[in-house]
Amino acid sequence: MLFALPALNDNYIWLYQRENLPLIIVDLPETDKLFAWLEKQNATIEAVLLTHEHDDHTQGVSAFKKRYPTVPIYGPQECEKKGATQIVNEGKILTANYQIDVIPTGGHTKQHVSFLVDNHLFCGDALFSAGCGRVFTGNYALMFEGLQRLNTLPDETIVCPAHEYTLGNLAFAETVLVDKSAVEKSAVEKQRIFVETQRAENKPSLPTTLKLEREINPFLQAKTLEEFTALRKAKDIF
């Protein structure tokens, strides 16, 4: 089971569960909707994963810990002050029922991480559909390196970003694909139509796949740091 629970203005809380096992929660932007959903599902929780320190991913931690004090909350070092109980900057997390790869994807924040669980990539604000996160650290090399790590994963990887930014990202992608192939242009246009339909029905545009992102995401297509940096700076003022 994979479910994107809308939160705040455009966040998603991702919930992942193998059949008949406790679930994993990715990021805690808020808790009211989450607690209602968990109660309705009569869910048990294996762990919480925090991708980075920003408030719109962590401001629900305090309330969550009061209600579920024994559930481990994993996150990078920067999330310790936000309430993470288990610090993970890279490597693997082994819980009772899951093996989780921790992939460094800094740049948006210094210690941002992404989590890979059963071919599901929970990438926070590192990678979006047709886009990537702003480089608030100013370290474009760190951001580019993190995206390159994600770009080595298989095509069938299911990509679960933390925000509903897809339409705006596709609009930018269309402006920078003028020199791209007809196949790539067609993929962007086709995805834009799909996303417009989804959003008109108040449905998520996500998840996506790494195969699709390789076709429509200019930041994954960037071959050099210089190309990536120019794209990101252009998107900042788009």
UniProtKB/Swiss-Prot annotation:
Catalytic reaction list: an S-(2-hydroxyacyl)glutathione + H2O = a 2-hydroxy carboxylate + glutathione + H(+)
Residues where Zn(2+) 2 binds: 56-57, 125, 163
Cofactor(s) the record lists: Zn(2+)
The enzyme's E.C. designation: 3.1.2.6
Record note on quaternary structure: Monomer.
Family statement: Belongs to the metallo-beta-lactamase superfamily. Glyoxalase II family.
Name this protein carries in UniProt: Hydroxyacylglutathione hydrolase
Organism listed in the record: Haemophilus influenzae (strain ATCC 51907 / DSM 11121 / KW20 / Rd)
Underlying gene: gloB
